[in-house]
Amino acid sequence: MAIRLEDKKAIVAEVNETAANALSLVVADARGVTVGAMDTLRKQARESGVRLQVVRNTLAKRAIEGTDFECVKDALVGPSIFGFSMEDPGAAARLFKDFAKEQSKFEIKALSVGGKLLEAGQIDALAKLPTLEQALGQLASVMIAPVTKLVRTFNEVPTKVTRVVAAVRDQKQDAA
């Protein structure tokens, strides 16, 4: 089915806008994956802030020109599904990695973060990135740890004095 030129321009503009606002991109080949499984993937993508798009490669190549994801052009061979992470850089990688475990025919082709092309085998590195909430929690615990240690140190001095006084008292009672 032929697509009109105006429609092609609209598709390119939409994908370009998505790519310009995305934090990371994962490209996969979904040949052989059932429609039901793809519907499940789309539902999970919506829940995790990932934008899925299936676009012809020629249109996709034009759409990602001038964006951080221009480096994935060479991976655009055959049918491709694009997963753009809009809020969390590792969201699309986690989603595609988990889906690939369930669907043996789902193959990850390439991924990109910050203009760098990563091989499909490096998806674990991107998938293991903490979410924003996890990163903030880790930062808070690192910042609170020295203060907590200082408070414990201050509390330790009176505790030691109390133990010494109790030991002297017990010693005097035993001597009496």
From Swiss-Prot:
Which SUPFAM superfamilies is this protein grouped with?
A: Ribosomal protein L10-like (SSF160369)
One GO biological process term = translation
Keywords of this entry? Ribonucleoprotein, Ribosomal protein, RNA-binding, rRNA-binding
Kindly list the GO CC terms recorded for this protein. large ribosomal subunit
Q: Which CDD domains match?
A: Ribosomal_L10 (cd05797)
Q: Which NCBIfam families match?
A: PRK00099.1-1
General function of this protein: Forms part of the ribosomal stalk, playing a central role in the interaction of the ribosome with GTP-bound translation factors.
Q: What is the recorded name of this protein? A: Large ribosomal subunit protein uL10
Organism, as annotated: Saccharophagus degradans (strain 2-40 / ATCC 43961 / DSM 17024)
Q: What taxonomic lineage is listed for the species of origin?
A: Bacteria, Pseudomonadati, Pseudomonadota, Gammaproteobacteria, Cellvibrionales
